[in-house]
Amino acid sequence: MEHRHEARTNGSLVVTINGRDKTGQFFNEQVLASRISKSGALLSGLSRHLRLGDVISVAYSGKKSRFKVVWLRDSESHHLIQAAIHLLKAETCPWMNTFRAV
């Protein structure tokens, strides 16, 4: 598991994600992003199973970026599936203007 040592915010955002699940089916859903940093977040509320290394699109406030899935967990709770994501190098963080202090 990767460990990041950068500032994170305790705030959360509703974001739209899309990509292909582990069966190859396209999906598009709204989930909650928390533990937000300049280069990643923890997504909660996913209803689709993903794989480590999958690349998904994350949209927030009219901006869209690609992230790599670096950690997954089926929470077996109202959080459904959780995924830690990390921003791809060539991308710009979609929530950067929302959390300037991050």
Indicate where each model-derived feature is located.
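Structured alpha-helical
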Residues: 1-102
